[in-house]
Design a protein with these regions (language model features):
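Short coil-to-helix segment of the ABC ATPase nucleotide-binding domain corresponding to the Q-loop/switch region
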Residues: 11-18
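Conserved ABC ATPase signature
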Residues: 46-50, 54-56
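Conserved catalytic motifs of ABC-family nucleotide-binding domains
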Residues: 67
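Hydrophobic anchor residue at the start of the ABC signature
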Residues: 60
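Catalytic Walker B motif of ABC-type/P-loop ATPase nucleotide-binding domains
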Residues: 71-74
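Conserved ABC ATPase "signature" region
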Residues: 25-42
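Helical segment within the ABC ATPase nucleotide-binding domain
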Residues: 86-98
């Protein structure tokens, strides 16, 4: 999941997600993903009809519907409001717990580190610190 959404402008939200689901071996359920990211009401809209945060949630849905073993996220909640951020983080947490997806989140938001198993901090392109998180905070309880 990148900061640039790369949505296909001539496809609806649902079609943008289906493109990926159709080539995936074991995709997640479309309705579950749309509901979890609170974008089910936009399923027939085109990207140009969505806000930046809504477009970001569609891009996240495209990545998640594949049911990947590894999910790399660059500023996952960067364009999202607090409510949407929490929804996305709860769904990522569920993917990790329920489906065993390894999630790597690159972020400047220190609060998100609270839900991580391991926190790796970089400085000047080098690992400056690596910590195991002994007190994980559920996504629902993060102060974002």
């Amino acid at each position: 999941v990148f900061q640039f959404y790369n949505l296909i402008p001539d496809l609806t939200v649902e079609e943008n997600i289906e493109v990926v689901a159709d080539i995936s071996a074991h995709p997640l359920d479309m309705d579950e993903v749309l509901r979890a990211l609170d974008i089910e009401k936009y399923r027939r809209r085109f990207p140009k009809e969505l806000s930046g945060g809504q477009q970001q949630r569609v891009a996240i849905a495209r990545a998640m519907i594949k049911n990947p073993k590894l999910l790399l996220c660059d500023e996952l909640t960067g364009a999202l409001d607090t409510k949407s951020s929490r929804q996305v983080l709860k769904f990522v947490e569920k993917m990790n717990r329920q489906f065993g997806t390894t999630v790597v989140i690159i972020t400047h938001n220190e609060a998100i580190a609270g839900m991580a198993d391991q926190v790796i901090r970089l400085k000047d392109g080098q690992v400056s610190e690596s910590l195991l998180n002994q007190r994980k905070i559920p996504a629902a309880e993060l102060v974002l």
